Amino acid sequence: VYGWDQGKLYKPDYRYLEEENADVALRYTDDSFESYDNIFRNARTEISDDDRKRLIDALKILSEASGGTEEDGEELSEAVNVDGALRYFTVQSFVVNLDSYLGPTGHNYFLHERDGILTILPWDYNLAFATYSLGMPEPINDAELYVNYPIDTPASGQIMMERPLFHN
């Protein structure tokens, strides 16, 4: 069975789109397990309180790292599979997957944790290639816009600032 000796697997997802869903954005808010219900409620493997604490500790490191110094980068690598995150965001940007961690809903990814290291994994690409239009009364139907979508800003500035896995 997956997860017994290979880490823990989560499928973070929001309960209500109208809520802030900081946990789905992988933002550290406090040490309370209840603050991360959208992660723990969607665990795909059995988890213990030790597993919950380890994940929250990793989120704290992720949220507190600014990425501005070499020390921040070293600390970040103690909590995040940095190479895996860079690969994930490269693909997300290339296929303009707005129904993902970088989209308005910030979901449709798996989160793997092993030994305190978080790895983001892709999931659900059915709305990739700029076909996502949730909340758009008149969806943008401009292929040229999406072909030229900027790879260095794959989401709005506000969304990017609220997603520490991308921002930091």
Identify what each model region corresponds to.
Residues 1-168:
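Phosphate/dinucleotide-binding and metal-coordinating scaffold of catalytic cores
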